[in-house]
A protein has these predicted regions:
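Glycine-rich phosphate-binding loops of nucleotide-dependent enzymes
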Residues: 1-157
Length: 157
């Protein structure tokens, strides 16, 4: 069998005396789709936040393509090819679609921000995935459905 693209081994996450994840194992192979199901408070978001670098496991290992990695922050996850569509939107309302998608990964031209390149990138990924959206629209002016598209495009960028 081929190497899993993502493996979470014996993940434990504690917050003080409360154990949110207790020995969780998850293996994902290329092309698979998984659903993480459970009641409110079951630890689903906590588990995914560890995979995305928003939280550090108390113990356990995360492997990407067979290599153990440490997720210190979301940038580490993104660099490892992991994106996350958040349950609660992580968008800055007064910013444009483009500004929200490239936030933290802004293209530069010398020391200046290259918003033309950023906008072009947003148009390209939205067309590639069939998620058309106005790259210049402000988040506060678009529907919740369009905001969800922005979250998806952020994960795909």
């Amino acid at each position: 069998m081929n190497t899993p693209v993502i493996e979470m081994r014996n993940i434990v996450k504690r917050f003080g005396n409360f154990t949110a994840n207790d020995g969780i194992n998850l293996t994902v192979h290329k092309g698979e789709i998984h659903a993480i199901l459970g009641e409110n408070g079951a630890g689903k978001s906590t588990l995914m936040n560890q995979l995305y670098g928003l939280l550090k496991p108390t113990s356990g290992d995360i492997l990407v393509n067979g290599k153990k990695i440490v997720m210190n922050n979301p940038r580490d996850a993104i660099d490892a090819g992991i994106g996350m569509v958040h349950q609660h939107f992580m968008l800055i309302q007064p910013f444009t679609v483009t500004e929200n998608i490239v936030l933290g990964t802004e293209p530069t031209k010398g020391v200046k921000l290259d918003m033309a390149a950023a906008r072009k990138n947003v148009v390209e990924i939205s067309e590639r995935y069939g998620l058309s959206i106005d790259p210049d629209a402000k988040i506060e002016d678009i529907s919740v459905g369009m905001q969800q598209r922005v979250e998806i495009l952020k994960a795909l960028d």
